[in-house]
From Swiss-Prot:
Stated name of the protein: Multifunctional CCA protein
Record InterPro entries: CCA_bact, HD/PDEase_dom, HD_domain, NT_sf, PolA_pol_head_dom, PolyA_RNA-bd, tRNA_CCA-adding_enzyme
Species whose genome carries this gene: Neisseria gonorrhoeae (strain ATCC 700825 / FA 1090)
Additional note from the record: A single active site specifically recognizes both ATP and CTP and is responsible for their addition.
Family, per entry: Belongs to the tRNA nucleotidyltransferase/poly(A) polymerase family. Bacterial CCA-adding enzyme type 1 subfamily.
Binding site for ATP: G8, R11, R91, R137, R140
SUPFAM superfamilies: Nucleotidyltransferase, Poly A polymerase C-terminal region-like
Gene3D superfamilies from the UniProt entry: Beta Polymerase, domain 2, cca-adding enzyme, domain 2
Domain HD: from-to ranges: 225-326
Domain notes: Comprises two domains: an N-terminal domain containing the nucleotidyltransferase activity and a C-terminal HD domain associated with both phosphodiesterase and phosphatase activities.
Amino acid sequence: MQTYLVGGAVRDYLLGLPVKDRDWVVVGADAQTMLAQGFQPVGKDFPVFLHPKTHEEYALARTERKTAKGYAGFSFHADKDVTLEQDLMRRDLTINAMAQDADGKIIDPFGGQRDLAAGILRHVSPAFAEDPVRILRAARFAARYGFEIAEETIKLMRQMVENGEADALVAERVWQELAKGLMEKNPRKMIEMLRECGALQVLLPEVDALFGVPQRADYHPEIDSGIHTLMTLQRAADMGLSLPERYAALLHDLGKAKTPPDILPRHHGHDINGVEPVREVNQRLRAPRQCAELAELVCRWHIIFHQVGQLKSQTILNVLKKTDAFRRPERFQTALNVCIADTQGRLNREHTPYPQRAHWLALLEAANQADSGKIAAECRAQGKAHFIAEQIDRARLAQIAPLQKTFRGA
């Protein structure tokens, strides 16, 4: 019985990165051997055990065989005769198919170290095509490390998409990998790789439809709506924004794909036109509520947020109410963060100031100076409870108006 450190721990060690989780493979053992040594079985799908002291995962070396479409259609074989190389061969990418023995020696039968040095993501074997999740994983690793995907691997990924493997992906797995990819250092790279292999058209057709749609060059020197979306997403990542904010950045301009061709490159109403596509994506991916709500909010209101200097005080108040800013000020702030990414996610505009954010927050703070509790109590005391909302609005407008006048005159 021999144990080896495998997978991501070896990869990150060789890259000089912190090793977060350590996974082990056991060669020359079976379930009875593991149980006799005090290991605890985990689940029943795979022969995986928890170490009695470290609680790290130890898996019996195994081979896998495709039995049906999708990521779940596998059967496995694990016994004492399965070799380390056979176990490593079933893994997705060469950089993940390395092991380290107890003496620190690296076992690398498929050239993972070579590909790490070259910055290449390459599939280990044709079995890569048996699991459609690997399309998403390869794109995610490209986003994490900035690596390129080998041409033969991209070709295989395209074939998988053409064969309908991507159609078999369930929403939970797509969201799981997408969310991880959005939180990587270069999330733009993930979307680019998914588009290059054709998977974006299957998984996020609303985003894929943005590519090739022109915008006004005076607002968008990058011209292409899809390129702007990638730049906005990447700017959100560079700003260190959260997952809901990055997700909203990805979906904020879906309405531009709905613009009638005869009015291009203008996109009047794309904020409103984008709401339904955003909802469709949210439902299809089963996006978490916080992500879904922020994406819809940003899509619907980002143009109005940009144009705050042109708005009347009454419109300002209406926007604050419709966006639920009084009850959910933190979400309102995150929406404005995405608007910064939208403004700066344009060619040669990455340092463009965005005073609108500070002004919106100042307007909200000013409106909150109106004592709604006191106003409500006074109205009730006077038998005019039906005037409460109107009186609160008047008080808020009285606070907003002078501040907005100053900003518009600046």
